[in-house]
Structure formats: structure tokens, C-alpha cells
């Protein structure tokens, strides 16, 4: 089963932000989505999750058509995402914050709290159940955001710069967490990040965007050595060297 974006085109005020981009994310795989600033990475995730309309193309998950669906409908179809800037309910406890996400996917109150406890324990936040989410460190807020995304038991999870702003210790802990998700939960994981060492460690396959178009995709080593990718990041001189 795969999450599939086919020929996705997005325009803003007549300017083409994505130009016929296609990718497939199978369950059980970690796919890295990379590219220079402004290449369209977040726009593609927004298009997949119903945040922005498509000018052309289609989105499907496990054969279920998602084109034109609202963000809530996409989430209920078990496609979850996180954001570059985390979204938190600072006035709720950590447990309540995650349980609220489970409630939004149809769980009852008792089941939602049980699900939240399970996820928080898994993410090393068990002792923080009753703390206000707003008082957590930046790294722990990231963990809570991922826990909230997992509360609906997604088949596909899209992470937008999940390690941005983290120190090395927190980043390493998050890496271990993300690496385990496809095996432990059978989900497909797409990661956007500018940290190439993180991407190369986590992702077996890469998809590269530049100026809204796909310029390379495939095995991480082959993509890293692709002249078009080197040029996009470092300029033509570096690619020709």
C-alpha cells in the first residue's frame, strides 16, 4: 500500500510552485524529500494533506482518492503530518494534548487517554503526563507533536523539518525514534529536512525538488552524487568539477 502523488501541479497567483511532481511512499519505507529553499517541499506536503488546492494531478492513499479532500478528511484517511512550526495546546497538559488528537479520530475518552499514555511512555514523556504542554522544552514539544500525529494510527506520516533547531543530543534521540516507526508501526514515513547527515542516515530513498520540479529520485547514494542535485545545492561550477 502506498501514498501516491501523481503529476501534482500547484499555482499561487499564476505562479507555478509545483510542476507535475510525482512520488510514491510505500508503507514501511522512509523517504527523504529534499531540495534548496523555495524548491516546493512544504508546498508538496501541503498539497498532499489538503492544505492547498491542486491545479492539476491527483493524490491517493492505498487506492483511496484524496484529491480535493479537506485536511480533516485526509487525516481521517490515515495520512498525518507535522509542521515546521509546531502546533500545540499550551494550556492543556501533555496527556490532554495527545488525547485530544485521539478524540479527533473517533476514540472515546477512556480509549483516547489510554492511547495518549501509551504514546507518551513510548516517547519517554511518561513522567510529564500532567505537565502543561506549554512548559516543555523545544525538543519535548517536538515529541508531543509526533505523538499527536500518531494518535490517529496513521498509515503515512509526513514530517516537515522535525529536527530543526535541535541540539545534537535531542536530534540523536529523535533519529532513533523516527528510524523505529516504519518497523514498529508499519507506516510510510516522509521526512523533509535540510540536515543531509540526518537524511542520509534515515532514508534509503530520496526525492529531490528544485524550482518546483523533480530533478532526481532513487537510491540515496546515487541521488547524492547526481550532477543535477549537486548543481541545485552548490551551483554549476561544483557540478562540473
Short names for language-model regions:
Residues 2-241:
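Glycine-rich phosphate-binding loops of nucleotide-dependent enzymes
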Amino acid at each position: 500500500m502506498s501514498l501516491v502523488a501523481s503529476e501534482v501541479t500547484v499555482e499561487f497567483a499564476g505562479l507555478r510552485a509545483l510542476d507535475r511532481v510525482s512520488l510514491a511512499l510505500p508503507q514501511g519505507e522512509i523517504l527523504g524529500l529534499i531540495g534548496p529553499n523555495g524548491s516546493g517541499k512544504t508546498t508538496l506536503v501541503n498539497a498532499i494533506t489538503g492544505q492547498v488546492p491542486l491545479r492539476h494531478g491527483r493524490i491517493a492513499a492505498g487506492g483511496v482518492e484524496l484529491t480535493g479532500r479537506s485536511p480533516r478528511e485526509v487525516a481521517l484517511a490515515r495520512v498525518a503530518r507535522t509542521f515546521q512550526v509546531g502546533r500545540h495546546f499550551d494550556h492543556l497538559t501533555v496527556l490532554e494534548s495527545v488525547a485530544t488528537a485521539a478524540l479527533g479520530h473517533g476514540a472515546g475518552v477512556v480509549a483516547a487517554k489510554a492511547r495518549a499514555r501509551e504514546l507518551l511512555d513510548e516517547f519517554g514523556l511518561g513522567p510529564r503526563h500532567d505537565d502543561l504542554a506549554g512548559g516543555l522544552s523545544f525538543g519535548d514539544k517536538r515529541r508531543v507533536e509526533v505523538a499527536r500525529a500518531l494518535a490517529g494510527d496513521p498509515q503515512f506520516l509526513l514530517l516537515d523539518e522535525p529536527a530543526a533547531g535541535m541540539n545534537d543530543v535531542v536530534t540523536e534521540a529523535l533519529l532513533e525514534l523516527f528510524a523505529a516507526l516504519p518497523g514498529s508501526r508499519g507506516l510510510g514515513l516522509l521526512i523533509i529536512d535540510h540536515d543531509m547527515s540526518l537524511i542520509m542516515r534515515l532514508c534509503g530513498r530520496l526525492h529531490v525538488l528544485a524550482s518546483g520540479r523533480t530533478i532526481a529520485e532513487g537510491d540515496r547514494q546515487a541521488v547524492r552524487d547526481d550532477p543535477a542535485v549537486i548543481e541545485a545545492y552548490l551551483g554549476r561550477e561544483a557540478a562540473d568539477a
